[in-house]
Amino acid sequence: MLKDAHQKLIKHRQSTKLSMTDFACQAAPVKQPLPLELPLPLSVQLQLLAKTPTSDHAPMHSTPPTTPPTPPPLPLNMSQSASAVTEAATPENSLPATPPSEGALAVPSAPQDHYSLRWNNHQNHILRAFDALLKTKTLVDVTLVCAETSIRAHKMVLSACSPFFQRVFAETPCKHPVIVLKDFRGWVVQAIVDFMYRGEISVPQQRLQTLIQAGESLQVRGLVESSVPEHTPTPAASPDDFGMLDTSMLSSTFEDECPTMVRPSKGGKLLMPSARLFGNASSAIAALGLRRKREQESDRDLESDQELGGSSPMPRRKQARPRRRSGDVPHDFTLNKTDAESLQTVIKHELLERAERDQEEAPDQDNSQGEAEKISSSPAKTLVERAKEQKSMKEEGSDQPRSLNENHHQLELDDEDDDDQDHEEEEEQDIEELIHTTNELRRQAAAAAANAAAMSPNPSPCLSDGPEDLCTTKKGKELISGPSSSADCESNNNNSSKLQDNNQRIMLSLKDIRQLNANPNPTAIHTPTSCSGGNNGLLTFPPPGLRPPGLPDSPPCHMEALEAQMHAAAAAAVAAAGSGEHPFHHMEHQMEMSLAAAAAAAAMHQREPRDPRDGRDHNAFASNLLGPMGMPPFGGHNGGHPGNSGPGNGCPGQAAHERLEESMNRLSKELGKEFGKEFGKEFGKEFGPASPMSLQGPFNAPDGPPHPPSPLPFPGMSSAMTLTPPHMFGLDSPLGLFPPGIDPGKLYNPLMEMSDPRDMPGGPPPFLKKKMPRPKGQHSAPRGGPPRSWTNTELTEALQHVWNKKMTTSQASRIFGIPYNSLLMYVRGKYGKSLKLEQLRKDCISGPPIEMLQMGIGGGSGGSTKNEKSKERKEKEKDKNSMSSNGSGGSANSQGGAPTSGSGPMQHSGELGPMGQLDLDLGLPLGPPGGPRSNSSEPDLLSAPNALFNPFNPQGFYPDFSGGFPGLPLSMLNLLPPAERHHAAAAMHHLGVSMDEDCKSVGSKQSSSVDEDYSGPGIPLSLEHRREISATGPPLTPSNGGTGHD
């Protein structure tokens, strides 16, 4: 039974609502079945009860039992052990535990003891856990898309901190919503998200108004001036009720570990949280320790008078209603203006907090601009003195209320608005003076840097409340330069704000282009100071606030600006070499990506400024910048505009990109003299005109419109074909497919001598040219397709080689560049008579191949005799009912030679009608290849064991056979006279020799025309002459009633 009771205690040990008395009651029946005394099981229970809080739950608060149990020694031991646990687990600055509920005390049997389990650092843990989940993007389920970036977050946290997000998520129940905040900049959304997750952020004063306006638009609790209700809505409320919520969703017990943005201290001061996102890390740690000390002291005073409920011990400050109403469209993200009171209270404390942290420094600069400026020491001293005076005014009443209780705090809350009104006018005056002083100092620095005596700066600040023009107004705190040392402020906030300011720069700086094209860099990027005369003489273009008033705010990115930046980069390299550093790194810092925009800016060099005075001011300003470095000014020595090519121009007829190229070459030579040849080569390789970064297109017509600039960071005006040599992708190259026995040098291809029209210099761009026919590669049939892309010469040579059996069709197709299907149609005779190929075909087929002539087989000469002619006529009259066709047996001297004689028709009997094509069994082309060919007909020409005209097997020719016999090979039938061939064919037919099915329809048009052309009288021939004729040029084979296929 003791084991059972022990297991039950272990099972329910982590319960927070069940009392220990219940466990004792469950274990109480142990004493009845055991024959032991009463104190033994009770002592066991006492050990279990006393051990449980100390061993397993060390950080616990335990309240002593109100009523002792029935045995008298039990309450003493229990209370002692419980009090020991309380002393061990309770820190000094913690709050007392929550009292037991009334429902638990209403047990009818006996009063029960309740143990309150408390997680001391629960709120800190929750905040850190949510922040860690946000940083690692774990379990994120919503994406906030702003003007230039996107931020992922958790719907639960956003809904808990903003009724606006709560209403949006309730009305659009999707798994991962994407909320587009197009009117908000990236740093604003990131700061609001960090404020909701961490409870505090640090904001520069010039950005404070924008942040509060965005917080009011998004109804962020802690940023919006609204009253928080005492009761939270139930989860059973309908989604329509969420629209009525202007206030807090949870009245949680946020205590000393989660301060709001602006909270009252005991002295009535407004305590701004320390710098965590925007400020210095060292000052943030010191301010955080000071704030925690103050909160611990206030908590000690509040601990005695605090109520025992679950509400927050911190008094809530008075707030006003938000701007947004429940009837507004939830996706209307227009910014609302804030009240002057809330803005002044926050700015007032911001001045005081900065004066406490930085006694010897001026306020921080705006990190998002990336612009560094130096200021003289006297204005900084005046700012510090003014901040000290404000601190002394604030600290007059700070020592009085150290021992005030909660009632005094309530009185201070009532007088908070009165204090704000008292200091409102004074602080407003200070802020305006600060802005005036800042603008005056910045304009003086610009005038000193530009050496523009005629352009006197006018310190007339332009105040604006809009969030978009922070780059030009309200820069009261942006004075002292220095690289930022914060670890987490450069990642999203500054990166996003730099993207907005790009359109107001006079040029594309390196930092902006890097952050446009790369991932955000968490480390601070060092940018050298500008226009101050220091920093080793490095001069860059000033930020928008430092420009002379005559210059436009957003001029186009001209080539002149890039050229000036190149000169400035050269000066940076000289200064770096003088200080002992490697000069190329500074050159790369200044010019790495600026030349990438050269291609886009080259097209803009012909564009005139709208106001001629703007161009003159721009050139004067740039010439003043380049004057100390000994560089030539932009507009030439005569002061002419660089876009004009006339007598007033210093470089007539020279475009801006040409001057840039010359300047690059000159800089490369000068740097080679200054730092050695290796550095000059390195500079020329990286930034020279031949590098891909500065490559200009090979076409820029002076009379035509310029090529539009490419939005890419590399030049988009050069085609890939213009960069490729023509021999790399020549479509007319045979690609190494020559047969082994053919010399490629003997083949004439006129297209190989043509130059590639795509590589012609000085022509229009490739995409503006008219579409030219490609030299090769048109896969088209002779009829019914697009125009053929080969010449008649190529086709004639290809057909001549194929018909003479020097090549196969596939070899000729690859060598001569004619598609295989088209060439095959020509080889088979399916072409029109307009190509004049009939004579070539007759010559090639009737004459022997060149190899046969080299073997000693000459072409015979002579015509048909009258006897032969009369004999052939008689045979023709006998077989006029049979299915036959006439052919020609004229001979030729060589390929392409004219036939000198014709042969009469070949007689066949009627029973030889289906056997008229036996001589084509092995693929020997004795007739015109006009009919369909089998797929294996060309290999049969070379692979037949006894092929007669096989050039690779000369042993297959037997010229001594004079007669035919039944066992004669089919190809040898061609050597017999027509009369003897008839008997041999009949004999083979009776022996069962079959024909090739592919050769049954080989008749063509040329058979009848040859009979008509060569039917004239001739010289009588003997049997030997007829054999030579048949051996030299086999006559056309009669077809089985087939007709020519056109």
From Swiss-Prot:
Which residues does UniProt assign to the signal peptide?
none
Q: Which GO terms describe its biological process?
A: gravitaxis; larval feeding behavior; larval walking behavior; male courtship behavior; negative gravitaxis; oogenesis; regulation of transcription by RNA polymerase II; ventral midline development
> What are the start and end residues of every segment in region (Disordered)?
54-109, 290-342, 355-501, 632-655, 686-719, 758-791, 851-947, 998-1046
**Listed Acidic residues bias regions:** 413-432
Bias regions of kind Gly residues — which residues?
636-651
Q: What is its main location?
A: nucleus
Q: Does the keyword DNA-binding apply?
A: yes
**Quick check: keyword Nucleus in the entry?**
yes
BTB domain: which residues? Answer: 140-205
Which PROSITE patterns does UniProt cross-reference here?
BTB, HTH_PSQ
Entry's Gene3D superfamilies? Homeodomain-like, Potassium Channel Kv1.1, Chain A
Q: Which Pfam families match?
A: BTB, HTH_psq
Coiled-coil region? none
Keywords of this protein's UniProt record, alphabetized? Answer: DNA-binding, Nucleus
Q: Which InterPro entries match?
A: BTB/POZ_dom, Dros_DevTransReg, Homeodomain-like_sf, HTH_Psq, SKP1/BTB/POZ_sf
Query: What cellular-component terms does GO give this entry?
Result: nucleus
Location of the HTH psq-type domain: 781-833
Q: Which GO terms describe its molecular function?
A: DNA binding
Spans of biased composition, class Polar residues? Answer: 365-380
Subcellular location(s) per record: Nucleus
Could you say which tissues express the protein in this record?
Initially expressed at blastoderm stage, transient accumulation at dorso-lateral positions of the embryo and differences along the longitudinal axis. At later stages of embryogenesis, expression is found exclusively in neural anlagen. Expressed in 4 posterior-most ventral unpaired median interneurons (VUM) neurons, VUM interneurons and one progeny of the median neuroblast (MNB).
Role of this protein:
Has a regulatory role during midline cell development.
Q: PANTHER family from the entry?
A: BTB DOMAIN TRANSCRIPTION FACTOR, PROTEIN JIM LOVELL
Please report the name of this protein according to its UniProt entry.
Answer: Protein jim lovell
Name the gene behind this protein: lov
